[in-house]
């Protein structure tokens, strides 16, 4: 039963991808795994959109970078210090360079839809790792322009964009903090 733990230990954030395009079947497999996630009232409120069109990926990158640039220009205080320390930038080349973008949506009217979608994303990330694929959960400051680009139905809300491909990112996974467990009370 150690296999799941090993996958979780191995999985890391990937922002750089090889140009080689993974088989679509590996993404479909990963989405089937995500579909097995628990959901509030068994609503299964997730919807997935695979984007592989180069022009559309470029448009998504442009609208995301525009909202990121505005965000970075206006951020202040401790958050700005943290972003600078980590060398984060408004540029998001992985949105164009990844062979695929997986857009994950929630049904607005479903009970506990956001919480449920993020459970599915956790399953999805582990399934991608199992297939040797990397990703980073990316949440732009403003999803509305992306929703327009992909003709999102009004009953859905974009929750996260996952660039997906074979990792070409040599940096190691950051160490995990020790698990701290309390019993009954804090």
UniProtKB/Swiss-Prot annotation:
Its cofactor is FMN. GO terms for molecular function: FMN binding; iodotyrosine deiodinase activity; L-tyrosine binding. Changing residue 112 to A: No effect on binding to I-Tyr and Tyr. Strongly reduces affinity for Tyr by more than more than 2600-fold and reduces affinity for I-Tyr by 18-fold. L-tyrosine binds at residues 41, 68, 72, 92. It catalyses: 2 iodide + L-tyrosine + 2 NADP(+) = 3,5-diiodo-L-tyrosine + 2 NADPH + H(+); iodide + L-tyrosine + NADP(+) = 3-iodo-L-tyrosine + NADPH; 3-iodo-L-tyrosine + iodide + NADP(+) = 3,5-diiodo-L-tyrosine + NADPH + H(+); L-tyrosine + chloride + NADP(+) = 3-chloro-L-tyrosine + NADPH. The keyword Nuclease does not apply. It comes from the Bacteria. Keywords: Flavoprotein, FMN, NADP, Oxidoreductase. 3-iodo-L-tyrosine binds at residues 41, 68, 72, 92. FMN binds at residues 11-15, 38-39, 176. Its EC number is 1.21.1.1. Changing residue 41 to F: Increases affinity to Tyr and decreases affinity to I-Tyr. One of its GO terms (biological process) is tyrosine metabolic process. It is an enzyme of class 1 (oxidoreductase). PANTHER family: IODOTYROSINE DEIODINASE 1, NADPH NITROREDUCTASE. Belongs to the nitroreductase family. Homodimer. Catalyzes the dehalogenation of halotyrosines such as 3-bromo-L-tyrosine, 3-chloro-L-tyrosine, 3-iodo-L-tyrosine and 3,5-diiodo-L-tyrosine. Activity towards 2-iodophenol is weak. This is Iodotyrosine deiodinase. The gene is IYD.
């Amino acid at each position: 039963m150690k296999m799941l733990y090993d996958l979780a230990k191995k999985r890391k954030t990937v922002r750089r991808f090889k140009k080689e395009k993974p088989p679509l079947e590996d993404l479909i497999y990963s989405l089937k795994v995500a579909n097995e996630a628990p959901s509030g009232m068994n609503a299964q409120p997730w919807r997935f959109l695979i984007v592989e069109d180069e022009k559309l990926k470029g448009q998504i990158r442009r609208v995301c970078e525009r909202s990121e640039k505005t965000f970075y220009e206006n951020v202040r205080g401790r958050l700005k210090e943290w972003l600078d320390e980590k060398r984060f930038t408004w540029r998001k080349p992985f949105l164009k360079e990844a062979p695929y973008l997986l857009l994950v949506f929630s049904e607005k009217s479903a009970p506990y839809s956001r919480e449920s979608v993020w459970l599915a994303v956790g399953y999805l990330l582990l399934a991608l790792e199992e297939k040797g694929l990397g990703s980073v959960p990316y949440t732009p400051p403003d999803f509305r322009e992306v929703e327009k680009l992909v003709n999102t139905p009004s009953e859905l809300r974009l929750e996260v964009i996952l660039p997906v491909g074979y990792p070409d990112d040599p940096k190691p996974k950051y160490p995990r903090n020790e698990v701290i467990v309390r019993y009954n009370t804090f």
